[in-house]
C-alpha cells in the first residue's frame, strides 16, 4: 500500500491491478449489449416505454449511419444539450462509433453559459430538445457558427408534430432524430480509433477555480474508470437489478454510471428527464428499483420527507451518493428510517479523473471516509507549502495518477500544466489524508468552488458576470452553507463612485443570465472594498463568514 521511490512516499490501491482492455468505447459497449439482445435496457420514466438491448444496439448503429450521411469526420464534435432521455444512449455511442466526440452540457444553460462552454469546442452538430432549440435559434449562428446541423429530439411524444413542422420550414439546418435514424444501420465505415490518444468526450469542469474548461477524456480514460469501478462494486449489483437514472447524463457522474457502467453490465435503467420527488418514488415502487444513484439533496429527502412513507420502497437495497459530500448525520437518519436495511455508499472523484478515484467498498464503510483508492492508480499527498510528499496520516493536497487521468483541458495547455505535474499526477485541489487501512479522508474541500445541489459553481464566473454590470466597480463571490442545497452563492459588490444600485436591481439583472442553481440565494451585499492580498488575489476566506447589514 505504501511504496518508496527515490525516498518519496506514494500510496497504491489495496486492490491488485486489473487488466483494462485497450478498446474504443462503442466496440466494448456494443459487444456487451449484443450479448443480451432480449433484455430490457432502458425504460422511459414518463411513458413507461421499454427499449431492449437489441433495439438500443441497432439504434446506436443507425445514429452512426445517419451521421455518416451528414459527412461526420473523425474528431468532429457533436454537442448534446439534452435532459435524460432514452435517445441519449444511442446518440452518445453512435457519435463515438464514427470517431466523433460528444460534448455534453446542461440543457438549462442560458445562451451566455453555452457561449462560455459548448461553443468553445466548435461543435459541428447539436442534439437538442424543441425547448432548447427555441431558446438558442435566434443566436444560433452567432454563438455556434461552426454548427451545420441541429438534431431535434422529442420528449415522450409531446413535441413530434412541432418538430416535423420545423424540419419542413427551416432552412435545412434542422432535422429530427427520427430522420437521423431512418436508415438500415449498416452503411457506415469502420473508423480507426486510438483509445489512449483519441478524445471521446468533452464534459466541462471548472477544476478547483476559474471559468469552465473543456475536459478531454479519451476512450481509454472512460473504459479504464468503468473497469476500475466495476472491480470493487461487484457485490453491489445482482443480475436482474433495476436502477434509477435521475442523475444528469451531462454530468460526468451520471454519464459514467448510465451511459457506460450500467449499459455494460446490462442493468435495466429507468430514465427520468428531471428529478420530481413523487414521480421518482412512484417509479421505484412500480419497477422495484434496487439501486439508486443520488446527490445529497435527494438523500435528505430520503432522510426527512414525509412523502417517502407513502410508497413501497422495499425493493431498494442501495443508495449511492456522489457529486458532493454526504454528512454522516443524514446517512444515520436514512439508516434509522429504513431500519438499517439500506446500504448507503459514497465515492469521490473529479471530471478530470473520469471521474472516480475513491469508492467505499460494500460492507466496509468507515464513517466520514471518501473511500479507498481504485485499482491501477497511484496517489501521493503533498504539502501545500513545500510540495514535498507526505506520509500516512499527514494532511496535504491529494494527487492521483492512473489511466483515468484526463488527456488535458481543451486548447488550454497552460491550465493543463497547472493541474497535471511532470510525473503525470493530477492535483485535485482538495486537502486530505490516508489512514493505516487505506481509507482516504477529505478534510478541506477546494476552497473556491461552490457546490450547489451537486453542481459546480465557479465563483470566478459569477464575479465576471457582476463585473460586467455598468455600475459595479468590484465583486467577490463566496459559498454560503444552506442546508439541503449544500452551498449557495453570496455576492459582495463595490458600487462605482457616484452611482446607486439596489440588491433587487442587481439580482433582476443577473438571474436571467445564469442557470437557476447559480442564483444568488445567499444574497448580494454592498461593501466599501473587496479584501485582497498584496498580489491582488481575492481573499474570499475573509468574506466567508462576513455578514454586514444590507443597504
Curated annotation (Swiss-Prot):
Coiled coil: none annotated. It is an enzyme of class 6 (ligase). It holds the Pfam family AMP-binding. One of its GO terms (biological process) is phenylpropanoid metabolic process. It catalyses: (E)-4-coumarate + ATP + CoA = (E)-4-coumaroyl-CoA + AMP + diphosphate; (E)-4-coumarate + ATP + H(+) = (E)-4-coumaroyl-AMP + diphosphate; (E)-4-coumaroyl-AMP + CoA = (E)-4-coumaroyl-CoA + AMP + H(+). It comes from the Eukaryota. Its cofactor is Mg(2+). Pathway: Phytoalexin biosynthesis; 3,4',5-trihydroxystilbene biosynthesis; 3,4',5-trihydroxystilbene from trans-4-coumarate: step 1/2. GO terms for molecular function: 4-coumarate-CoA ligase activity; ATP binding; CoA-ligase activity. Its EC number is 6.2.1.12. CoA binds at residues 274, 453-454. Belongs to the ATP-dependent AMP-binding enzyme family. PANTHER family: AMP-BINDING DOMAIN-CONTAINING PROTEIN-RELATED (PTHR24096:SF149), LONG-CHAIN-FATTY-ACID--COA LIGASE (PTHR24096). Carboxylate--CoA ligase that may use 4-coumarate as substrate. Follows a two-step reaction mechanism, wherein the carboxylate substrate first undergoes adenylation by ATP, followed by a thioesterification in the presence of CoA to yield the final CoA thioester. This is Probable 4-coumarate--CoA ligase 1.
Amino acid at each position: 500500500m505504501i511504496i518508496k521511490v527515490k525516498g518519496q512516499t506514494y500510496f497504491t490501491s489495496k486492490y491488485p491491478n486489473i487488466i483494462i482492455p485497450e478498446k474504443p468505447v462503442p466496440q466494448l459497449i456494443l459487444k456487451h449489449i449484443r450479448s443480451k439482445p432480449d433484455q430490457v435496457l432502458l425504460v422511459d420514466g414518463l411513458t413507461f416505454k421499454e427499449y431492449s438491448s437489441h433495439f438500443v444496439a441497432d439504434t446506436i448503429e443507425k445514429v452512426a449511419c445517419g451521421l455518416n450521411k451528414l459527412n461526420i469526420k473523425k474528431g468532429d464534435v457533436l454537442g448534446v444539450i439534452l435532459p435524460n432521455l432514452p435517445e441519449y444512449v444511442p446518440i452518445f455511442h453512435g457519435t463515438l462509433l464514427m470517431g466523433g466526440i460528444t460534448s455534453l452540457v446542461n440543457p438549462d444553460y442560458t445562451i451566455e453559459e453555452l457561449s462560455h462552454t459548448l461553443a468553445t469546442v466548435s461543435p459541428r452538430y447539436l442534439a437538442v430538445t424543441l425547448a432548447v432549440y427555441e431558446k438558442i435559434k435566434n443566436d444560433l449562428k452567432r454563438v455556434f457558427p461552426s454548427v451545420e446541423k441541429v438534431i431535434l429530439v422529442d420528449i415522450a411524444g409531446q413535441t413530434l408534430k412541432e418538430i416535423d413542422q420545423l424540419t419542413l420550414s427551416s432552412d435545412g439546418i434542422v432535422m429530427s432524430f427520427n430522420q437521423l435514424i431512418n436508415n438500415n444501420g449498416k452503411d457506415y465505415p469502420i473508423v480507426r480509433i486510438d483509445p489512449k490518444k483519441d478524445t471521446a468526450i468533452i464534459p466541462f469542469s471548472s477544476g478547483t477555480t476559474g471559468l469552465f474548461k473543456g475536459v478531454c477524456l479519451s476512450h481509454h480514460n472512460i473504459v479504464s474508470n468503468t473497469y476500475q469501478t466495476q472491480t470493487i462494486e461487484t457485490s453491489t449489483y445482482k443480475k436482474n437489478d433495476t436502477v434509477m437514472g435521475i442523475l444528469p447524463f451531462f454530468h460526468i457522474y451520471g454519464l459514467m454510471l448510465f451511459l457506460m457502467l450500467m449499459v455494460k453490465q446490462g442493468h435495466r435503467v429507468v430514465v427520468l428527464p428531471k428529478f420530481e420527488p413523487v414521480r421518482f418514488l412512484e417509479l421505484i415502487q412500480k419497477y422495484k428499483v434496487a439501486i439508486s444513484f443520488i446527490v445529497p439533496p435527494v438523500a435528505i429527502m430520503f432522510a426527512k420527507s414525509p412523502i417517502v412513507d407513502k410508497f413501497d420502497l422495499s425493493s431498494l437495497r442501495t443508495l449511492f451518493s456522489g457529486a458532493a459530500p454526504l454528512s454522516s448525520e443524514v446517512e444515520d437518519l436514512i439508516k434509522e428510517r429504513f431500519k438499517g436495511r439500506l446500504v448507503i455508499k459514497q465515492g469521490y472523484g473529479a471530471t478530470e479523473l473520469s471521474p472516480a478515484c475513491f469508492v467505499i467498498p460494500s460492507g466496509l464503510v468507515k464513517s466520514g471516509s471518501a473511500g479507498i483508492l481504485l485499482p491501477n492508480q497511484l496517489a501521493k499527498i503533498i504539502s501545500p507549502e513545500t510540495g514535498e510528499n507526505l506520509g500516512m496520516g499527514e494532511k496535504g493536497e491529494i494527487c492521483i495518477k492512473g489511466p483515468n487521468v484526463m488527456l488535458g483541458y481543451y486548447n488550454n495547455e497552460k491550465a493543463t500544466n497547472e493541474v497535471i505535474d511532470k510525473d503525470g499526477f493530477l492535483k485535485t485541489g482538495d486537502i486530505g489524508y490516508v489512514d493505516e487501512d487505506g481509507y482516504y479522508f477529505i478534510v478541506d474541500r477546494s476552497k473556491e468552488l461552490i457546490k450547489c445541489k451537486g453542481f459546480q459553481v465557479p465563483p470566478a464566473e459569477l464575479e465576471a458576470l457582476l463585473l460586467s454590470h455598468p455600475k459595479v466597480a468590484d465583486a467577490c463571490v463566496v459559498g454560503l452553507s444552506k442546508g439541503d442545497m449544500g452551498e449557495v452563492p453570496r455576492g459582495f459588490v463595490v458600487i462605482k463612485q457616484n452611482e446607486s444600485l439596489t440588491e433587487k436591481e442587481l439580482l433582476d439583472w443577473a438571474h436571467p443570465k445564469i442557470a437557476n442553481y447559480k442564483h444568488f440565494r445567499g444574497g448580494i451585499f454592498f461593501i466599501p472594498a473587496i479584501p485582497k492580498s498584496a498580489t491582488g488575489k481575492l481573499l474570499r476566506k475573509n468574506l466567508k463568514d462576513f455578514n454586514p447589514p444590507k443597504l
